[in-house]
């Protein structure tokens, strides 16, 4: 956190003395923070968060820059792909496919090509950890799902929203897409997309509106290791500490992205109000 504090102060163009005065602490305290000899207390971090908000300091971008710098310091062998992972309580022991079963692509170890989504997923958890990881995909079986209606239906299957048509050819088609695969690669239902996708599942928007949302949002990709073999191919490259203050800014970013998703869904719904089919109509036709 010491580099971030210094970066904030320099962004504001303040000396350590002036910065300390703004935060209601001593020069020596700020000096210890920036030298890494002490960490700000929770109260001090809250004060710093509130001050940065008032001064419109781009802390979220600074967090991304910190991760980018750490990423650029990593050198990988051929065949390895660099990815990001967020954990609510940190990785202990071997990496295993042990997420909740009803995630986008079922139970697995989830990684992203972009840091933003795993960061906002863990921002509400005090003991959360952020990791830069890599995976060797050369010996793994995998399937890659394009960002289209098939992707949304596959997510619906894994989230348990298709049980009413279990046993149909339509259900079996999607239940078998990633069966026996070590790795599933597909778009991320991020903070913006989550609201749009939920609106599709609950019948508020059609498949046409959903597909156009997918195109507009330009979603990043996630890699999901669903087997022990795939998890054994993953290596932790770096752990990036995330402070309480940073988590507050990540919460703000998550809320803002969710609101953008709501706005987007509402706008697209107006344009495609009756074009296409609703989710329940798709399921009814499959019975």
What are these regions (language model features)?
Residues 10, 24, 41-61:
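DNA major-groove recognition helix of helix-turn-helix/homeodomain DNA-binding modules
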């Amino acid at each position: 956190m010491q580099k971030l504090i210094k970066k904030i102060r320099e962004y504001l163009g303040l000396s350590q003395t002036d910065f300390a005065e703004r935060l209601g602490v001593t020069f020596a305290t700020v000096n210890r923070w920036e030298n890494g000899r002490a960490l700000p207390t929770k109260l001090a971090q809250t004060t710093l968060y509130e001050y940065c908000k008032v001064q419109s300091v781009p802390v979220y971008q600074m967090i991304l820059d910190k991760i980018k710098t750490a990423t650029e310091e990593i050198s990988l062998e051929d065949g390895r792909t660099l990815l990001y992972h967020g954990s609510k309580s940190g990785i202990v022991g071997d990496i295993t496919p042990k997420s909740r079963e009803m995630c986008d692509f079922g139970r697995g170890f989830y990684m992203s090509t972009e840091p933003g989504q795993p960061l906002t997923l863990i921002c509400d958890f005090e003991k959360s950890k952020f990791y830069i990881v890599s995976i060797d995909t050369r010996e793994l079986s995998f399937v890659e799902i394009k960002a289209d209606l098939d992707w949304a239906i596959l997510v619906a299957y894994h989230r348990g929203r298709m049980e009413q048509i279990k046993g149909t050819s339509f259900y079996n088609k999607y239940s078998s897409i990633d069966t026996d695969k070590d790795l599933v690669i597909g778009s991320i239902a991020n903070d913006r997309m989550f609201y749009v996708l939920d609106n599709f599942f609950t019948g508020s928007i059609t498949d046409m509106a959903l597909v156009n949302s997918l195109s507009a949002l330009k979603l990043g990709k996630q890699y999901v290791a669903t087997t022990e073999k795939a998890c054994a191919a993953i290596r932790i490259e770096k752990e990036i500490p995330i402070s309480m203050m940073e988590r507050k800014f990540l919460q703000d970013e998550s809320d803002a992205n969710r609101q953008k998703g709501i706005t987007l869904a509402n706008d697209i719904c107006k344009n495609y109000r009756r074009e296409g089919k609703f989710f329940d109509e798709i399921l009814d036709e499959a019975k």
